[in-house]
Design a protein with these regions (language model features):
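Short, Lys/Arg-enriched N-terminal segments with co-localized hydrophobic residues
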Residues: 8-22
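N-terminal beta-loop-helix "entrance" segment that forms/cooperates
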Residues: 63-80
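N-terminal beta1-alpha1 ligand-phosphate binding loop
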Residues: 24-55
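Helix-loop-strand module that forms the ligand-binding subsite of alpha/beta enzymes
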Residues: 76-157
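Secondary-structure boundary/capping motif
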Residues: 37-40, 69, 104-105, 141-142
Length: 211
């Protein structure tokens, strides 16, 4: 990955262990790419929050109050957008939980990402560990949306969790409103997903200044 210290003795030349050991406490922000009151992806996000391992806290970074982005705002950023970018800065990593609309991400999520990237040169996702997950009734739930989203995050220079991929097939009653997961296999997958993302966060916990 560009900018990281290199070591020819490890695969791909990337030396992660120089960034410090596992963090004892992590705060992970999550963005739900839907503003629907009945969103199953919001229930998935609540499940992740409920399943967070010891020492990890998940907090929502809301997007519903962001206005439509326009370059006209760059000279005078609205406070809601300032707060949104600060919320991203304040967490150790971000999980984006996205539905799939018309084989891509919802407009409300794209709008939030545009705010995060502006003004030019002040991208809130630069070197921010990020993970993508989503659920739908399909066996490859939200796969097309996630590919588009990962392309955006790559442009943002955001280290993004590669494996496991978060394609969760939703069935009636799988997620309760409070985040309860009724299927043990799904709960186990989500727990492993959070652990893998925690490992990614740890690798970037002490990236040298200026990287």
């Amino acid at each position: 990955m560009p900018g990281l210290p290199l070591d020819s003795t490890v695969p791909n030349g990337i030396r992660f262990d120089s960034f410090g050991g596992p963090m004892t406490n992590r705060t992970i922000g999550y963005i739900v790419g839907s503003i629907s009151s009945t969103s199953i992806n919001r229930r998935l996000a609540k499940a992740l929050e409920r399943l967070a391992p010891e020492g990890t806290t998940l907090v929502e970074i809301p997007i519903k109050d962001l206005p439509f982005y326009s370059v006209d705002h760059d000279a005078d950023f609205p406070q809601v957008a300032v707060d949104f970018k600060q919320a991203i800065a304040d967490v150790n990593g971000v999980i984006i939980v996205t539905p799939e609309y018309s084989r891509s991400i919802p407009g409300v999520l794209k709008n939030a990402l545009d705010w995060a990237a502006r003004p030019y040169g002040q991208n809130a996702f630069n070197l921010k560990p990020t993970a993508v997950i989503g659920t739908s009734g399909s066996g490859i739930g939200t796969a097309a949306a996630q590919q588009h989203l990962k392309a955006i995050l790559s442009h943002f220079n955001a280290p993004t969790l590669g494996q496991p991929e978060g394609y969760v097939q939703s069935t009636p009653g799988l997620f309760g409103e409070d985040g309860e997961v009724t299927n043990d296999e799904t709960a186990g997958f989500l727990t492993g997903y959070l652990e893998a993302f925690g490992d990614l966060i740890d690798r970037y916990a002490e990236v040298p200044a200026g990287v």
